[in-house]
Amino acid sequence: MELENNFEGKVVWLTGASSGIGKELSIQLSSYGAKLILSSRNEQLLNELKLTLQNTAEHIVLPLDLSDASSFPEKFKYVTEKYGQIDFLIQNGGISQRGTASESSEEVVRKIMEVNFFGNVLLTKTVLPALRKSKGQIVVVSSIAGKFGFFLRSSYSASKHALHGYYESLALEEESNGVSVTMVCPGKINTPISTNALAADGNKHGSMDHNQETGMPVSICVSQLLKAVAKQKREVLIGNKEIKAVTLKRLLPRLFWRVIRKQSPT
């Protein structure tokens, strides 16, 4: 598949662009000729990333805090004045969790939901008029944790489950307007997501999970992701053997629970 045909000259707003899957998306999309709006909270990392991308002058850095929805209209106005259109909104920004449900503070629960769910959907609502105009596509980077719960990820899993319900509904509603939605469910991918995850007390987890260290290389993950986007798939599972758990849960739920309780939380 020639991905240049799908992304060349297209305007892509990407959240969570400064690291992990978002950073690799920036690299690969720029190689296909896309024009990128690079967003995350870390402006310094975004500026450093932009300098490494192909066609540097075509991209802009736009710092964005998903917990500050009041800033979205102004950011949206800036993007549309700059580019005149938005073809893809890739919702990759978010925060993970490494703490038990019983010990995680209310602040942690609310912060995860605010960033992963409320900020995500409110940005989509802000950008939706432009996507209707361009007959564009929303890409939501969820997780296999959006398909089943797992140790130390209660609020994270809840936020991802919520995204699936919201965007499955939105996809049905917006199909007649020409807007498509692709849900991406990565499994164990070699990114620093666990390092930046929130512990039960709200501090950073601060270490790399073994599951992440031994996970699928992020370049392969993103390559598969972009192929799914180009095909306008409604949903794609990306990872190694762990993604088989989704099918196992659906077909043999009792066996699924016996297997999953034996897995390492990290």
Regions found by a protein language model. Give the residues of each.
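Residue(s) in the substrate-gating loop at a strand-loop-helix junction
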Residues: 143
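Substrate-binding pocket helix/loop in short-chain dehydrogenase/reductase
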Residues: 100-101, 105-110
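SDR active-site lid
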Residues: 176-240
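Active-site helix of classical SDR
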Residues: 124, 159
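Conserved glycine-rich cofactor-binding loop
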Residues: 18-19
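Conserved glycine-rich Rossmann-like NAD(P)H-binding loop of the short-chain dehydrogenase/reductase
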Residues: 32-49
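The beta1-alpha1 cofactor-binding region of Rossmann-like NAD(H)/NADP(H)-dependent oxidoreductases
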Residues: 63-74, 106
